Curated annotation (Swiss-Prot):
The keyword DNA-binding does not apply. This is Flagellar L-ring protein. Keywords: Bacterial flagellum, Cell outer membrane, Lipoprotein, Membrane, Palmitate, Signal. It comes from Shigella dysenteriae serotype 1 (strain Sd197). It is a lipid-anchor. Belongs to the FlgH family. The basal body constitutes a major portion of the flagellar organelle and consists of four rings (L,P,S, and M) mounted on a central rod. It is found in: Cell outer membrane; Bacterial flagellum basal body. The lineage of its organism: Bacteria, Pseudomonadati, Pseudomonadota, Gammaproteobacteria, Enterobacterales.
Amino acid sequence: MQKNAAHTYAISSLLVLSLTGCAWIPSTPLVQGATSAQPVLGPTPVANGSIFQSAQPINYGYQPLFEDRRPRNIGDTLTIVLQENVSASKSSSANASRDGKTNFGFDTVPRYLQGLFGNARADVEASGGNTFNGKGGANASNTFSGTLTVTVDQVLVNGNLHVVGEKQIAINQGTEFIRFSGVVNPRTISGSNTVPSTQVADARIEYVGNGYINEAQNMGWLQRFFLNLSPM
């Protein structure tokens, strides 16, 4: 009976230790939804005997002679030049000081006995002080550079373009994901069909990965459980 209990205890211990390697990573994607968009089909062209066919889509059949090639329809592509360089610092300090002092005296011999024992007095003095000093500081910086070609998935009523895109790079046993979304003003698009990420409104840039390297950087769920319970 004791051998069975010891055997069960050993198996339970090994099971608990093995669970420390399991990691559940709760993460919410910063860029949600589809990361690509298909062009919208236009009306079926009808032959009218003219050289100019107005029913043809602008970018997929008819291209004006003096019109640029900037994206303006759903499904058009645009290259985002990632130029993110953000730094922030914060410091604070506080000082407080308070001092107090009290002094008073009283007779130790009753008045009717002062002629016999003399006038004896006692002095009592009390003082106190309180001092507080506090300082704090924080620094943060991040740099992100590169290029990513995105797709127009929505044309807003004011002409701005909502773009979204994703790039996947497989390296050995892991995969890196770069996702981007934001609102682009067509006036900021250069002649080479590029726009810097610093001129994109509501930009969402996400750089994540999966694989054993990413898993090794995360704490197991059981370790996190004991970490939350630890008073230290």
